[in-house]
Amino acid sequence: MLTAVVGLQFGDEGKGKFVDYLSGNINNIARFNGGANAGHCVQHGNLRGSFSQLPASLNKKNLYICQGALISLPILVKEIDFIKKEDIDSHIFIDPRCHIVLPLHAELNRASEKYKGKQKIGSVGVGVGACVEDKANRHGIRLIDTFDKEKLRSKLEFLWSIREKQINHVFNAQASLDFEEMLETTHQYGKRIEPYFTFTNEIIGDLLNSGEDVLLETSQATFLDNSFGTYPYTVAYQTLVQTCFAMIGIPAQKMHIVGVMKSYMIRVGNGPFPTELSTEQADYIRERGNEYGTVSKRPRRCGWLDLSLIKHAVKLNGVIELAITNVDVLAGLDEIKVAVAYEIDDKLVCCDNALLQLDRAKPIYKTFKSWSTLNSSYTDLTELPIELIDFLSFIQDYTGVPIKYISYGPDRNQTLVVK
């Protein structure tokens, strides 16, 4: 059976921790979308890993990168080297149909953002958006193209001829890359990962047909989806969990979907954020939650939990249980607020409507008492402070979905499973 982990906010909800946690009982973990524009951090004891290409697991498992994923070769190789260095003897399978995010894409991305000025999206500048453009325009470079250096040269020359003109003459920047160096580096990295090449759709399809469990890791999050998110302040692809079937290449089927959410809201980059805090409360949350980008290292914008968005994300993805993270971060505040509805021009609006004009939406809040500093270990829900239990109960009632997992620290073991 398929189990999928999906983010219900703007990313950085803690999906990596729950992929790692759930992988303790599932041998096959697959990543099917996104690229190195977002990282998932996992920690077990003194071992800490950050993954933006490989599935986020510190367990010895079968790891699959499916054809919908976008590959930054130096980062992928670095992650492979990390798990080998730490003696995490996972078996890695990479689909050769994955498209490559080139240094040229990153340079184009940065030039585009600079050119847009105040209209910029706030991209981390990895180049994923430009890679998606090339894939859609049918002149992208895939992993399979790295085998033959002369074939790779021909494809890169064509792509270079288009993108260099765009950088120099459209965005008024100056392309600074060395073509021959990019060609050689891409070819050598391709040779390095060639032993892992596999048609992952066939393996995963066979596993599911034989009754095996497969855990899916969704990159980014619901409201960064370029159709249902806060467009245009989104990523360049779809992030809803049901896109997995096309991105992997398997038939649609039943899934067990775990929605991951933080106990507050964060956002990286530009875009509307109705519950954003600009007070010392934001600094308190940011420092206690270490809210700095895994990839960009930029300070994340912080705000109160927005349950209108969470409930909408639950419906969009078909979530059947929730995992909530960072409840320890809110401990010690005088009070905690939760947005339960929106007003625009003094009229209540539904979430779909609000998302079209979220910069104008005024949140309506419910206020909760905070709780004291949490312990280092819990075994039962009743051991938690009553104020936290009230907070969690309200989330369950509002969303209509049970909270199954409560994370109260970064370590894998700092997770309470609600029975």
Swiss-Prot record:
Decide whether keyword Cytoplasm is in the record.
yes
**Pathway of action:** Purine metabolism; AMP biosynthesis via de novo pathway; AMP from IMP: step 1/2
Q: What class of enzyme is it?
A: ligase
Keyword flag Nucleotide-binding: yes
EC number per UniProt: 6.3.4.4
Name the family the entry cites.
Answer: Belongs to the adenylosuccinate synthetase family.
Provide the function of this protein: Plays an important role in the de novo pathway of purine nucleotide biosynthesis. Catalyzes the first committed step in the biosynthesis of AMP from IMP.
Q: What is this protein called?
A: Adenylosuccinate synthetase 1
Record organism: Photorhabdus laumondii subsp. laumondii (strain DSM 15139 / CIP 105565 / TT01) (Photorhabdus luminescens subsp. laumondii)
Q: Organism classification, top ranks?
A: Bacteria, Pseudomonadati, Pseudomonadota, Gammaproteobacteria, Enterobacterales
